[in-house]
Every structure is written in structure tokens, then in C-alpha cells.
A protein has these predicted regions:
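Primarily recognizes the serine-hydrolase "nucleophile elbow" in alpha/beta-hydrolase
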Residues: 151-217, 229
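Mobile cap/lid helix-loop segments that gate and shape the active-site cleft of serine hydrolases
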Residues: 56-59, 199, 206-237, 243
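Short, surface-exposed "cap/lid" segments of acyl-processing enzymes
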Residues: 85-89, 93-121
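Catalytic nucleophile-loop/oxyanion-hole region of alpha/beta-hydrolase
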Residues: 109-114, 118-119, 130-167, 293-294
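C-terminal catalytic histidine-bearing segment of alpha/beta-hydrolase fold enzymes
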Residues: 248, 255-265, 269-316
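Alpha/beta-hydrolase
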Residues: 96, 204, 280-283
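Short beta-strand/loop motif that positions the catalytic acidic residue
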Residues: 241, 247-249
Length: 316
């Protein structure tokens, strides 16, 4: 136990410029307070937050796991940092990825678990990666997902500097169901702070306006009353987003998903805010989309270009 606290003490001292003084009891008390602030102690187990992964794509990347940003067991996030963490502050790639709105008793299906590759891409390319899990229907219906995005954004703004990240350069990425939660967060100002707190947005293969053909998982989140779907959609509020947007869907997406993406693009363009649009070549996950294919039609290059633009313009 003492070794664990010493490791965390050195980490916090290096980052925050703190010095350790006083009795051991005072030291442990002060450290515990800081641990709670940054969410490093999720459940009282005291697990050391950083670890490495053997995957080639994550070589040289360190993780801080299961950092709590809300009260629910699913309100956790992971942070990935690279070797350059200590040399400068970095843009943040914040990923909300989920293949469904629902899970049995609010527990996510393992097939829909977040993947590390997306945030490893961030950490290995001069960014800090953050991936977010959120509450699921039927236990947590609309607008729980958008509220969770708001809470996670708040956590990042309060704490990401401890990991070498810049809170004023957050690029918010939503994939699949996560894309709706991100779009809903941006489109409904009543669910967030007046300033959405993001410098750029990436939306991938999402639905943005539920309709009467909603499947069972979607109905468990949006409700069975289709007359309420219009008010719960991302339209028209999403067109008021001022941050630059990258919009993507896959060539193998269902016609319904493609139509959703095309509708969002049309509405944004009509509002004078055309997104950069990419059609991915058969990508079935955000992590695979971040690996460039032979035709360079993945998301890696557009995201890196967006980040460079934000840094050069000093946004927000």
C-alpha cells in the first residue's frame, strides 16, 4: 500500500509542483484528497492507474484506467499518454464510442466495449487520448448519454492538465451511438454549460434524428412515443455549433445510417457550416478507421489536419 502511495505522490509532485511535508498521516490524507479530485481511485481498491499494453499500436503508450467522472459505475474514462507527455501540453482527442444505446440492466455488451486503438493513435501522434463510457438504456433513457458527455467534458476541463493535455484544445469524437450522444450534447444547450468546451468535433456513423423505424435498443433509449423523437433529435440545434466538424460514415453502413449522415451534412451546409466529409472504406469500428488504408480514406489524416488547424489558430 505504501509503495502505491509513494508512486502516486511522485506523480502528483512532478505534475503539480507539490512538496510532501508533515507526518505520514497528513501526507496520506492530502494525497487521498488529490486522488479523489482527479478520479484516480474509482472504487477504493487503490489500483495503480498507469499500465502498458503489449499491442503494437499501443507501444510506448501509458494508460490511466477507470477514472470516475460521475456517480454511475459506467461513468468512467481512460486516459492514454505518450512519451512526450512531460515536454509540453497537448491537444486532447476525446472519444465517445459505443455500438448500442442499450445494454441488459445498463451493463454494456462486450462486443460494444471501447477499444484502445483510437486513444493510442492520439497518444502516439502528439495528443492525449481519452475514451469515455456512458450509461445505457433501459435503466438510463434519453438524455442520459448527452448528460454523461457533459460530465466527462467537465472532468477533462478540470483534470486533463495533470496528464499533459490542453483543456482549450479538446476534439470531441463520437462513433455510432456515441455520435448521437455527442451531437445531442452539442445540439441541446439545456443539457450543458453555455460554452460546449470543444474546439473541434468528429462524428462517425451515427444517427442524429430517430424515427418511427427505431429498433428495440433505440426505443429503449428514446422511448416508445415517436411523437417525442423530433424534440430529442440533434436537429436543428446541431447547426448552431461553431466548432469545425468532420463528418464520416462507412461505405458498408446501412442505407439508413448513410441517409442520416447525408441529412446532417445538408443541414450544416445550408447553415453555412459545411463539414469536411469522409466516406470510409468498409471500416467497422472507429479504431480501424484511424488506420489509414491504401487510398488514404481513413480518419487519421483528417483528424491530424484538424488538430494542426486548431493549434495554428489558437482555438478556442
Amino acid at each position: 500500500m505504501m509503495t502505491r502511495y509513494l508512486v502516486l505522490s511522485l506523480l502528483l509532485s512532478a505534475i503539480m509542483g507539490a512538496s510532501v511535508r508533515g507526518s505520514e498521516a497528513d501526507f496520506l490524507s492530502d494525497l487521498a484528497a488529490n486522488v479523489v479530485k482527479v478520479g484516480l481511485d474509482l472504487d477504493g481498491s487503490g489500483a495503480v492507474p498507469t499500465e502498458s499494453t503489449p499491442d503494437d499500436v499501443c507501444t510506448g503508450v501509458s494508460f490511466s484506467r477507470n477514472l470516475k467522472y460521475g456517480e454511475n459505475d459506467l461513468n468512467v474514462l481512460d486516459v492514454a499518454t505518450g512519451d512526450s507527455k512531460k515536454t509540453a501540453s497537448h491537444p486532447v482527442l476525446m472519444v465517445v464510442e459505443g455500438k448500442s444505446f442499450a445494454g441488459e440492466d445498463g451493463v454494456p455488451d462486450t462486443a460494444g466495449q471501447l477499444r484502445d486503438q483510437a486513444i493510442c493513435f492520439a497518444a502516439r501522434n502528439g495528443m492525449v487520448g481519452v475514451k469515455v463510457t456512458y450509461r445505457l438504456a433501459p435503466a438510463n433513457p434519453w438524455p442520459a448519454g448527452a448528460k454523461d458527455v457533459a460530465a466527462a467534458i467537465s472532468w477533462v476541463h478540470d483534470n486533463i492538465d495533470l496528464f499533459g493535455g490542453r483543456s482549450d484544445e479538446v476534439v470531441l469524437v463520437g462513433y455510432s451511438a456515441g455520435a448521437f450522444h455527442v451531437a445531442s450534447y452539442l445540439a441541446h444547450p439545456e443539457l450543458r454549460e453555455p460554452d460546449p468546451g470543444v474546439a473541434g468535433v468528429v462524428l462517425v456513423s451515427g444517427i442524429y434524428s430517430p424515427d418511427a423505424d427505431a429498433n428495440a435498443a433505440e426505443k429503449s433509449y428514446f422511448g416508445n412515443d415517436a411523437s417525442k423523437y423530433k424534440d430529442r433529435s440533434a436537429f436543428p440545434g446541431i447547426v448552431n455549433v461553431e466548432a469545425p466538424i468532420v463528418l464520416a460514415w462507412a461505405s458498408l453502413d446501412s442505407p439508413g445510417l448513410v441517409a442520416q449522415g447525408e441529412k446532417l451534412k445538408a443541414q450544416l451546409c445550408n447553415a453555412g457550416h459545411c463539414p469536411r466529409t469522409i466516406v470510409l472504406s468498409g471500416s467497422d469500428s472507429l479504431s480501424s478507421a484511424l488506420t489509414l488504408d491504401a487510398a488514404n480514406k481513413g480518419l487519421a489524416a483528417p483528424i491530424e489536419e484538424l488538430v494542426r488547424e486548431l493549434e495554428s489558430r489558437g482555438l478556442p
